[in-house]
A protein has these predicted regions:
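Membrane-interface helix/loop caps of multi-pass membrane proteins
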Residues: 1-342, 355-360, 613
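Extracellular/periplasmic envelope-modification machinery, especially enzymes
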Residues: 218, 243, 305-315, 319-326, ...
Length: 614
């Protein structure tokens, strides 16, 4: 059976790539732009299965076609990104890029990012090749389908294979569903894994088999509404599927179902007018190039503009993405795929040489033999600011005492490392210590009622970071409230999370290196540095604080927001450095010793605690 061109598939590809690009550009028409990847996966499962089993492709022919389709554009994008990264990425981010290069050459970048990062974390803005995880995922599916193809070649086996795919699809779908419901806190990075996505590929494969059944194909052609219903399902999913940490989950089935319905509705031209327009078909044809180039372009834009892009800058980035993608499609992707550039032997020789070159680059970069241009600034800044102790955790002493019999208001902070920061800041200020006794217990010991300090306290403060901690459920705070109020009858206070900044390293150090700030220029740059800290705030922290505030209102307890003494929203700054040039954070959100002293003073000056009644 010949694989006839279906323009509505290109229209569907266009919707997929546009939603992904808008999502990465943080153009918030909708919250579920990441579902574009799910649409791509279903399309890929359908197209590859159709090519393999119903077009008499040989295995070698299939492999050559896929390599010609994927690798010329991919390798060019990787080389270009590496060149720009050399000039603009910070040393630590450039070193991480080396690992990405090696992982891409083995088509396992999805596994690398599974271990390295959370897809929803802001640290992804320092990884210009993060989007290649889905290309590795697709190549892994190619390997899977190639093995199946080698085993099931004749018509009889195709019938067996059809039911085999259905069985595997159902098993994987229900397995992922059960896992998501029962173990969702352990599901954070499954987004990257083939095991969590294979059922989506297989649904596309099942459609390819189903459309080979003439009666079903003819019946579906009569259902004019079927295609439009699938498109409606996808559009609805863009608004109702949000960004949970444990995606893919049950909601993934919505866009997958919509994509399946559209593909199933076959080549009924009367029902495809929405996807058959020339604009969407054009975007669909260059969708692979758009996907390849958009992410590194936006990463570098975010990098240049302190992770805070204006709408106009986003438009510029979109235009650059389009024109580079168009050039890449016309002069790289299409000529190589149509065999207009290089015959088989020459083509594979070129691919192997570039592969080896990128692999060597990855080894040199990840081992820091080849260092970024900013490395020289890195060395200079380290020498100019020897007392900053970049990347070193400060030594502290917080005495784990029991409360005394004094008349001071007694405050117990139940917290994690950020709760420790709060206690250290409070204890570092003499005026606060004259009025309050402040002690610390781990959140776990308070929650499990193993702390002996609750009974002797006047106030119990819950101070944990929520996201990224093992106490990542808001319900745990409500559980602690019930313990404190019901069993001990103490006053309970919820403390908001500490501002976190978009970096996996020292943010002040990043600023000094990127701008090559000398020791003499530091004081003059303090306002710019503090604005830089505000520009690099993680967006999700505000949402977490809003949720904590609502919980405090429902429980009728006090809510204290750390933003009140760390940041100022009116003038758009967060303290990252004080007026004497002392650094206040040693990583993405933890105080230095100087920071604890500084914030202790701010807590006192703003009367942040406001606890006057014993």
């Amino acid at each position: 059976m010949k694989l006839t061109y279906r323009p509505e598939i290109d229209g569907l590809r266009a919707i997929a790539v546009l939603t992904v690009i808008f999502y990465h550009a943080k153009i918030n028409f909708f919250k579920g732009g990441f579902i574009g990847v799910d649409i791509f996966i279903v399309i890929s499962g359908y197209v590859i299965t159709k090519l393999f089993f119903f077009n008499n492709y040989s295995l070698s022919n299939f492999i050559e076609k896929r390599i010609r389709r994927l690798f010329p554009g991919l390798l060019l994008m990787i080389l270009t990104t590496t060149l720009f990264s050399y000039f603009f990425l910070l040393p630590i981010h450039f070193m991480n890029l080396g690992q990405s290069l090696m992982a891409n050459m083995f088509s396992i970048s999805n596994f690398l990012f599974f271990y390295q990062t959370n897809y929803w974390d802001s640290a992804v803005l320092t990884k210009p090749l993060l989007h290649t995880w889905s290309i590795s995922l697709e190549i892994q599916f190619y390997i899977f389908i190639s093995i199946i193809f080698a085993l099931f070649r004749n018509y009889f086996f195709k019938i067996i294979l059809f039911f085999f795919f259905i069985s595997i699809f159902l098993i994987l779908f229900f397995d992922n569903t059960v896992f998501e419901i029962n173990f969702r806190e352990f599901n954070l990075n499954n987004y990257f894994l083939i095991f969590a996505r294979l059922w989506e590929f297989l649904l596309g494969s099942i459609i390819a088999f189903a459309l080979n059944i003439k009666k079903l194909d003819n019946y579906l052609k009569k259902l004019n509404f079927f295609h439009n219903f699938g498109l409606l399902v996808i559009l609805i999913s863009l608004f109702i599927v949000q960004t949970p940490l444990n995606y893919p989950n049950l909601s993934t089935f919505i866009p997958v179902l919509g994509s399946a319905i559209i593909i199933l509705s076959s080549n009924n031209q009367n029902s495809h007018f929405l996807l058959n327009n020339s604009f969407l078909i054009h975007i669909g044809k260059i969708s692979y190039s758009l996907y390849l180039w958009h992410f590194p372009i936006f990463i570098f834009f975010f990098y240049f503009f302190d992770f805070n892009l204006s709408f106009l800058n986003k438009v510029y980035a979109l235009l650059i993405t389009y024109f580079i993608s168009l050039i890449s499609y016309k002069f790289v992707e299409l000529p190589f795929y149509k065999k207009k550039l290089l015959q088989k032997k020459s083509f594979f020789l070129l691919i192997i040489l570039v592969y080896v070159f990128i692999l060597i680059l990855g080894v040199l970069i990840s081992s820091q033999i080849l260092k970024s241009k900013l490395h020289f600034n890195y060395v200079k800044i380290k020498n100019d600011f020897p007392n900053y102790n970049f990347f070193q955790i400060p030594k502290r002493i917080v005495l784990d005492n029991q409360f005394t019999n004094s008349d001071k208001i007694k405050i117990l902070v139940c917290g994690d490392s950020h709760g420790f920061d709060l206690v250290y800041a409070l204890q570092s200020n003499s005026e606060i210590k004259n009025k309050y006794e402040i002690e610390l217990s781990s959140f776990g010991s308070c929650l499990n009622e193993t702390s002996l300090k609750i009974d002797k306290s006047d106030y119990v403060l819950s101070s944990i970071q929520i996201e990224g901690s093992r106490y990542n459920k808001f319900e745990d705070i409500e559980k602690l409230y019930k313990i404190v109020k019901t069993k001990y009858n103490k006053k309970f206070i919820i403390v908001g999370v500490t501002p976190e900044f978009k970096t996996d390293s020292d943010l002040l150090f990043n600023y000094l290196v990127q701008n090559n700030i000398s020791k003499e220029d530091l004081i003059n740059n303090i306002p710019s540095i503090n604005r830089y800290f505000h520009n690099n705030l993680k967006f999700n922290i505000t949402n977490i604080n809003k949720k904590l505030f609502l919980i405090s209102k429902n429980l009728n307890v006090i809510f204290l927001n750390k933003f009140d003494y760390i940041c100022n929203e009116e003038v758009k700054f967060c303290y990252g450095i004080d007026q004497e040039g002392k650094k206040l954070f040693f990583d993405y959100s933890h105080y230095t010793n100087d920071g604890a002293i500084f914030f202790g003073k701010k807590i006192y000056e703003t009367d942040w605690l406001k606890l006057n009644l014993k």
